[in-house]
Design a protein with these regions (language model features):
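Hydrophobic residues within the alpha-helical transmembrane core of Major Facilitator Superfamily
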Residues: 19, 47, 125-126
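Alpha-helical transmembrane segments of polytopic integral membrane proteins
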Residues: 16, 89-96
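Structural signature of hydrophobic alpha-helical transmembrane segments
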Residues: 2-13, 78-82
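Short aromatic-rich membrane-water interface segments that cap or initiate transmembrane helices
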Residues: 1, 66-80
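Transmembrane alpha-helix/helix-exit interface in multi-pass inner-membrane proteins
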Residues: 43-59
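N-terminal signal-anchor/start-transfer transmembrane helix
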Residues: 9-31
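Loop-to-helix transition at the N-terminal end of transmembrane alpha-helices
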Residues: 28-48
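Hydrophobic, aromatic-rich membrane-embedded alpha-helical segments
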Residues: 110-133
Length: 147
């Protein structure tokens, strides 16, 4: 399959995982299952790309120029993209699971998921801020033991 087709397929399939995370209510485990299966598939694709093409790339991770040279190889650039897709989806899955565990509204989770999908760490930072506030306010509302 041409690399451009693999790129399009991976980029389209990951949307199903994000849609499941955003649309399926917390009480249904389907969203987690869909997202994890897609992340596993993307991780397998990543491993296959790295296994097949790693030796063909020039460059490395020692400098920005080295990384640029490494990503000049189309298959390794695709591998980097698939890496982003898989890891961001796993972070989004964790955000959803954690939001459900702490009782964070799905409506508050949605901007976090959108930002994690588009800008990775920015969405995670927003989620962590919301998580902190939610946990802090929950503690204030809990009765003190022995009173």
């Amino acid at each position: 399959m041409p690399l451009e087709s693999v790129f399009s397929l991976a980029s389209s399939v990951v949307l199903l995982g994000w849609l499941a995370l955003a649309a399926v209510p917390y009480r249904f485990p389907l969203a987690r299952l869909v997202a994890v299966v897609i992340a596993l598939a993307l991780s397998t694709l990543y491993a296959a790309l790295m296994g097949a093409f790693w030796g063909e790339g020039k460059g490395g991770f020692g400098s920005l120029a080295d990384v640029s040279a490494l990503f000049a190889h189309p298959a390794l650039l695709l591998g980097g993209w698939v890496h982003y897709l898989a890891f961001d989806l796993l972070v989004g899955t964790w955000e959803r699971e954690e939001a459900a565990a702490i009782g964070l509204s799905r409506w508050l989770l949605l901007p976090c998921l959108g930002l994690t999908f588009m800008f990775g760490p920015v969405g995670w930072l927003l989620f962590m801020a919301m998580r902190f506030v939610r946990k802090a306010t929950s503690r204030q509302l809990e009765p003190v033991a022995g009173t």
